[in-house]
UniProtKB/Swiss-Prot annotation:
PANTHER family: UPF0273 PROTEIN TM_0370. This is UPF0273 protein PYRAB02580. NCBIfam families: thermo_KaiC_1. Disulfide bonds: none annotated. Pfam families: ATPase. Keywords: ATP-binding, Nucleotide-binding. The lineage of its organism: Archaea, Methanobacteriati, Methanobacteriota, Thermococci, Thermococcales. ATP binds at residues 30-37. SMART domains: AAA (SM00382). Residues 3-247 form the KaiC domain. HAMAP family: UPF0273.
């Protein structure tokens, strides 16, 4: 029986029938404003509360900004960094400016996937990480989409090999039907897609689990909200043809 890794996000583990199977790599796909980053950070924070060390790979935002944004939800990771439970991999600044003074793990050349993997592997080793978030994986192949699946598989090999359960944040444009990059959906164990739809003149958030290797899961689209404590998913409600229905 595969061990389950609880997301700790209210309602989400019900939809996943117990959590994400250990070592799975999950693509968290969605357009702008859908809540991808918050979901992934909440997954890491909840892991820390369960005693599971975690790593956040920052590709889209300055690491300082990431820490500030997390703290707004009450997720202050600095204490865990000092205790060797949490690590930030800076793949945003390339070590320019003051980052090299503050950040321990820096990727200097994003076009060199081997350097990226080596820095990530070192961070995993140092803190014995159990959870990893890459935000966003799309940045790694935005200029070379043909390599998307290859890059995903290289990362998956390293992460699953070290026993980590991982979330790859994947960006898609508004209205796009795919998951962000050609063939990426075939290189991961799970896909959770977040959406933002207009219903009766109001934007509503929802998510659906497209696939999750190693477990059954809800096949319905469930609404969720972003609160001041993070994401809350409603497993007893379904978004259907522009309406939210109670189950």
């Amino acid at each position: 029986m595969t061990r389950r890794i609880k997301t700790g996000i209210p309602g989400m583990d019900d939809i996943l029938h117990g959590g994400i199977p250990e070592r799975n790599v999950v693509l968290l796909s969605g357009g702008p404003g859908t809540g991808k980053t918050i979901f992934s950070q909440q997954f890491l924070w909840n892991g820390l509360q369960m005693g599971e060390p975690g790593i956040y790979v920052a590709l889209e935002e300055h690491p300082v900004q990431v820490r500030q944004n997390m703290a707004q939800f009450g997720w202050d990771v600095r204490k865990y960094e000092e205790e060797g439970m949490f690590a930030m991999v800076d793949a945003f600044t390339a070590g320019i400016g003051k980052s090299k003074e503050y950040e321990k793990y820096i990727v200097h050349d994003l076009t060199d996937i081997r350097e990226f993997i080596e820095v990530l592997r070192q961070a995993i080793r140092d803190i014995n990480a159990k959870r990893v978030v890459v935000d966003s994986v799309t940045t790694l192949y935005i200029n070379k989409p043909a390599l998307a699946r290859s890059i995903i598989l290289q990362l998956k090999r390293v992460l699953a090999g070290t026993g980590c359960t991982s979330i790859f944040v994947s960006q898609i444009s508004v209205g796009e039907r795919g998951f962000g990059g050609p063939g990426v959906e075939h290189g991961v164990d799970g896909i959770i897609r977040l959406d933002l739809d207009e219903i009766d003149g109001e934007l509503k958030r929802s998510l659906i689990v497209w696939k999750m290797r190693g477990t059954s899961h809800s096949m319905r689209r469930h609404p969720f909200e972003i609160t001041d404590k993070g994401i809350v998913v409603y497993p007893d409600r379904v978004l259907k043809r522009g309406k939210i229905l109670e189950l």
